[in-house]
Design a protein with these regions (language model features):
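Noncatalytic, solvent-exposed loop/strand surfaces
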Residues: 1-225
Length: 225
């Protein structure tokens, strides 16, 4: 395949490795290494300035594959054929264009951040069945003086029906409750340790959330009480 490499973790599904490059979403047979299918993701949307940089692992749910990336590129839902040899696009959404980390599928909705520029974005919710944008909202948290501080874009993960959002520029980590037309920020705090960017995706295992920044790794108890 031609095109730029990507910063994406592959997904293993039904005997295939599903992956994204700068140009394609594609599936590779685990046993033979043969490429079973490709989808021209780079040409799926029209951008004024095309940047074939993919940093978001695809979401796979049964025969459905959700692919997104930043830079005004948007999100597409693909349906994998029963024989595993082809895909077809079911819908495209121009609002949800997550740049870093990931999006999540929760109760039939896709949650993630949008890309306005490399320092800012909003948080969005998209209907997974129709591709309709349900809401988009700025992310704001209370400052020390009680005034709301606008934050940017970043990473979204989920556990126990709640969303954890990690701002990739300022290091703010927030717990959010998804609602019908917005996200309700329950609590938040800032990651102050480590160095450089906040690009590592937090992970949750057995009620413990692991957060890395640079050469420092921290663990937090996030079990539902």
């Amino acid at each position: 395949l031609d095109g730029q490499v990507a910063y994406v973790t592959p997904v293993v599904h039904n005997g295939q490795i599903i992956q994204i490059t700068g140009k394609y979403v594609f599936g590779t047979d685990i046993k033979t290494g043969k490429i079973r299918w490709t989808y021209d993701f780079a040409s799926a949307f029209e951008e004024k300035e095309r940047r074939e940089i993919s940093c978001v692992t695809p979401l796979v749910d049964g025969q459905f594959i959700i692919a997104t990336r930043g830079y005004n590129h948007g999100t597409v839902l693909l349906e994998l054929a029963a024989d595993g040899n082809s895909v077809k696009p079911l819908w495209k959404n121009n609002d949800l264009d997550t740049q870093h980390g990931g999006t999540v599928l929760l109760n039939g909705h896709i949650y993630g951040s949008t890309w306005i520029n490399n320092s800012s974005g909003e948080w969005a919710c998209v209907d997974a069945q129709t591709g309709r944008t349900i809401f988009m909202q700025p992310w704001q948290v209370p400052g020390k003086d009680g005034k709301l501080i606008p934050l940017g874009k970043g990473i979204t993960i989920a556990a126990d029906g709640m969303l954890y959002q990690f701002d990739d520029k300022r290091g703010t980590l927030a717990l959010a409750r998804p609602g019908q037309d917005n996200l309700d920020i329950v609590s938040s705090f800032n990651i102050t340790y480590g160095t450089k960017e906040y690009w590592a995706c937090p992970m949750i295992s057995d009620g413990v959330m692991y957060v890395r920044r640079g050469d420092v790794l921290a663990a937090y108890d996030v079990k539902a009480k």
